[in-house]
Regions:
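Membrane-anchoring alpha-helices and their flanking helix-loop junctions
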Residues: 1-86, 98-158
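Extended, alpha-helix-rich binding/interface surfaces that flank or overlap catalytic cores
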Residues: 94
Length: 158
């Protein structure tokens, strides 16, 4: 029987999901670049873009693997059953969000698209001001000392 005091879902029910926010940032940046192209670096630097993007994908996949190994869901709308402290979570409390940021940075360099950097700013602002504080309140409420200890020992970003 479930405990009626426990929340029914994860920390983000009804909230615009971060993957959608970052997809919107990418699509907006590309659309703006098509309308008003703003290149910001020599084209030779574009070779770094695929490398940064690949690092982003690897970080995302490693983070997902740790969630699966801990037996908890990565989806913000589903119940969180464990605090993940292994893999990339040893260094950052938000490696999935870091992977989203790295992906947009990598695409920006790869495509030499300044607008992607511009649209990244509100996406990161939304994470920092709305999503992460809400997630942290949820985790503190549901995992008390376990999350407080983790929060004290691992930085939010890097």
């Amino acid at each position: 029987m479930s405990n009626p005091t426990e929340p029914k879902g994860g920390p983000l029910p009804g909230l615009l999901r971060p993957p959608i926010v970052f997809l919107a940032a990418i699509l907006s940046g590309i659309a703006l670049n098509r309308a008003w192209s703003l290149q910001f670096m020599p084209s030779t630097f574009g070779l770094l873009g695929p490398l940064v993007s690949l690092c982003a994908v690897l970080l995302f996949l490693l983070s997902l693997r740790e969630f699966r190994a801990a037996g908890t869901s990565v989806r913000g709308s589903e119940r969180t059953t464990a605090i993940v402290r292994t893999g990339p979570y040893r260094f950052s409390r938000n490696p999935i969000y870091l992977s989203f940021i790295l992906l947009v940075l990598g695409l920006s360099v790869w495509l030499n698209d300044f607008w992607l950097l511009v649209t990244l700013v509100p996406a990161v602002g939304f994470l920092a001001a709305v999503v992460i504080p809400r997630e942290e309140r949820f985790l503190e409420r549901n995992f008390h000392d376990q999350y407080s200890s983790y929060k004290a020992s691992v930085r939010r970003w890097l």
